Amino acid sequence: LPESAGEYAARIDSADTRIRRFLVKEDIITIPDYVKDLDTNVPWIVRPGGPNFWEQVQFRNPTPDHLHAVIPGHRFDGLLERHNTHPIRGKITSAARTEGWGVYLEEAFMNVGLLDDVPRVRELIHIFGIFRAARVPADVWLQLNEMTVDEVVAWWMERTPWLDENVARVDAEIYLRRPPGYGLGYTIGMLQMQQ
């Protein structure tokens, strides 16, 4: 794990540069000139109890979350959406489409060579996948009132490396506030992208 905000910022810059270069070199996605620095999804925070789940992954290597949430993920996707004047394509309103795209990117970039020389990053993406897989049945159980938030939190924490109670609780509560199927949408959306 990085020992300072500066070291972490350097890791983010390195991941961003690596991803952008790969996108251009492999002619995967055109990056419009108006797309500049898109920042990061996980800021540097020193917590008394140590890093939370997302920080455990991100601080080790920002690449997985950068793909999902920054470029070519959510921030990039959202910026392109705001610049798209098409009445249909200019409006992305499906959570399954949005989250599915992010998950698809993680999987796709493992398969097209971006991570060939950094196999430990694949492990980080697989840890994300473990948490997402655990979230699928729990999303259903919460909506059916078959499990409480506390039960889901405990169930997830038993199955997911590094998962802390705070992140698990926030995710469980998000699923109760969103339309049913939000947790499923990550996986279903990715499968739809693959089709």
Provide a role label for each language-model segment.
Residues 1-195:
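N-terminal maturation segment of proteins
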